[in-house]
């Protein structure tokens, strides 16, 4: 039969999606009523009032039309100032691109530095979206396991994974899902490797304001020789509780930012116009950031102390972000079995085998409320110690 006349024939989608995973998504759906949710990496705090009132004011003032695609000059300048103040990163406002969330900034960065079949090193386990993003544009993710004792990079493993197709190293410190914060010496060595092999560094710094234990955030862009090859990624979602407002940015060398601007010009155009000024105002809400951080610090202490003495669980005290990465192999259960058992006990958890290198671990978000953390601890203890 002539295919053109067969109305039951359906065209197929591109093969690039055939093996594309969705990471933690199945476990990020709202759980049954009454179940404590320890899964979503989303601040439970309300967005700072100055941000809300500014966004509303901008809407009422008619800021609903097209605007400068790269971001308003005032916002780009504010981001450059913020990077210097908080991370000692020196960047010109012209080399900042405001994006619809940090995810979009990541995608633009990968499109900027990777040609088809180029390899990208991921320090595994890593955030669930890095690998599929790289794959979808034709890049090749190369997962390099971190040290499972503390989740810090194994430099020898990084070096041995480099080939003539390697183009970039992905850095995420503080790290989702492990909570690791890389030391200055580790960042310096990663930069040294990148210089030696002429590689780009994509540095996801979305959790840079959430560091515990008196640690410090060190960006590869602040290390000698690193600025010229590092694209910094960050955004407003985690620090200022603005996940649904979708504002992020990338900053880096001129040639990389110019290419990323072209990506945005031919896709999203720009973030919502009324969010430009609201995002700028958020950068001045330091009192909210301090209050949020104090709450996370307390919740981290509660959850670690509440779970660390349970037989079969191995807990590494998280150094940053708001995640706890728990080794459950000592319980005799797989991570999926553990998550299923926890759900029956009334706590929703994420089995980390859904991402490369996460087998045997559970990811917990202590961005949950203090009340939910206390109740979740009680339920898990009752289940595991009965």
Question: Predicted segment positions?
Answer:
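N-terminal signal-anchor/first transmembrane alpha helix
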Residues: 20-24
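Short beta-strand to alpha-helix junction loop
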Residues: 70-71
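Glycine-rich loop-to-alpha-helix module at the N-terminal edge of alpha/beta enzyme cores
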Residues: 38, 62-64, 78-86
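PLP-dependent class I/II
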Residues: 1-17, 29-36, 42-58, 74, ...
């Amino acid at each position: 039969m002539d295919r053109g006349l067969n109305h039951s024939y359906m065209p197929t989608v591109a093969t690039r999606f055939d093996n594309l995973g969705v990471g933690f998504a199945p476990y990020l759906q709202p759980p049954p009523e009454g179940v404590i949710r320890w899964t979503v990496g989303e601040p439970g705090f309300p967005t700072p009032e100055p941000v809300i009132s500014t966004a509303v004011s901008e809407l009422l003032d008619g800021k609903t039309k097209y605007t400068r695609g790269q971001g308003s000059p005032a916002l780009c300048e504010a981001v450059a100032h913020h990077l210097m103040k908080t991370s000692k990163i020196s960047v010109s406002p012209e080399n900042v691109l405001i994006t619809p969330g940090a995810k979009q900034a990541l995608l633009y960065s990968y499109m900027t530095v990777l040609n088809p079949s180029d390899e990208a090193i991921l320090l595994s386990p890593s955030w669930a979206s890095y690998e599929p993003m790289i794959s979808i544009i034709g890049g090749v993710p190369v997962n390099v396991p971190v040290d499972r004792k503390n989740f810090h990079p194994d430099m020898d493993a990084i070096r041995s994974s480099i080939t003539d197709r390697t183009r970039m190293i992905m850095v995420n410190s503080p790290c989702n899902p492990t909570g690791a914060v890389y030391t200055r010496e580790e960042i310096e060595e990663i930069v040294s490797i990148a210089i030696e092999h002429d590689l780009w560094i994509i540095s996801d710094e979305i959790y840079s304001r959430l560091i515990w234990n008196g640690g410090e955030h060190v960006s590869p862009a602040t290390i000698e020789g690193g600025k010229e090859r590092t694209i910094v990624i960050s955004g407003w979602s985690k620090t200022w509780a603005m996940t649904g407002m979708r504002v992020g940015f990338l900053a880096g060398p001129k040639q990389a930012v110019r290419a990323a601007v072209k990506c945005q010009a031919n896709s999203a155009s720009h973030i919502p116009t009324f969010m430009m000024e609201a995002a700028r105002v958020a950068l001045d809400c330091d009192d909210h950031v301090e209050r949020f951080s104090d709450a996370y610090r307390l919740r981290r202490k509660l959850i670690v102390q509440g779970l660390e003495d349970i037989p079969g669980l191995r807990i590494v005290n998280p150094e940053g972000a708001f995640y706890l990465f728990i080794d459950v192999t000592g319980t005799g259960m797989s991570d999926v079995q553990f998550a299923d058992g926890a759900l029956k006990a009334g706590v929703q958890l994420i089995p980390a085998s859904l991402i490369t290198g996460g087998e045997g671990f559970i990811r917990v978000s202590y961005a949950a409320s203090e009340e939910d953390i206390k109740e979740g601890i009680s339920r898990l203890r009752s289940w595991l110690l009965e």
